[in-house]
Amino acid sequence: MIIRTLGADDAEAYRALMLEAYEAYPQAFTSSVAERAAMPLSWWQKRLDNPLDRLLGGFHGDELAGIVGLAFEPREKARHKVTLFGMYVTKACQLKGLGRRLVEAALDEARQHPRLKVIQLTVTAGNDAAFALYQRCGFIQYGLEPLAVRVGVDYFDKIHMWRELHDR
């Protein structure tokens, strides 16, 4: 499997994979499949070209099989932080190490930016596999956001996690 930065040329594959993710795990994302399906392809292209976001894709052959994003902070006082977001691996490639490789690639990418000190993320409470993966990659829980996401009549909490990017 190959992991690389996605660009505007990957917009169709990125859109298809994220719509699959929103459909399969609606509680894991703050966007809904209906909201994102309504967005034109140009919106997805702009997302991939946004200088404040970096999206990494994991490819199985020519097929995009996993994704993870980094959102850089534009505000001066928070530019030392980056947020890991949009993590998803297709069911066919789950439990094969792609998730860990994507997280490690995101950490490596973040370390290329000297001003960054901290990487943070949220994971839906009850998503034990993702929580354990993040722990194995050095993240620690620092908070719990109750009722963070509503899907239909159900509410889901979000676990907040972080880790330092460099040794002190």
Give residue spans per PLM region:
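Extreme N-terminal starter segment of soluble prokaryotic enzymes
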Residues: M1-I3
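Acetyl-CoA-dependent GNAT
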Residues: T5-A11, R15-A16, E20-G86, T90-A92, ...
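Short hydrophobic/aromatic beta-strand or adjacent loop that forms the aromatic wall/cage
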Residues: D53, F156-H160
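Glycine-rich acetyl-CoA-binding "A-motif" of GNAT/NAT acetyltransferases
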Residues: E63-G66, A129, Y155
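Conserved hydrophobic beta-strand within the GNAT/NAT acetyltransferase core sheet
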Residues: L84-M87, I119-V123
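Active-site acidic-Proline motif in GNAT/NAT acetyltransferases
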Residues: T90-A92, K96, A125-G126
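Conserved GNAT acetyl-CoA-binding A-motif
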Residues: A110-T122
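Conserved catalytic-core motifs of GNAT/GCN5-like acyltransferases
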Residues: Q120-V123, Q135, I140-F156
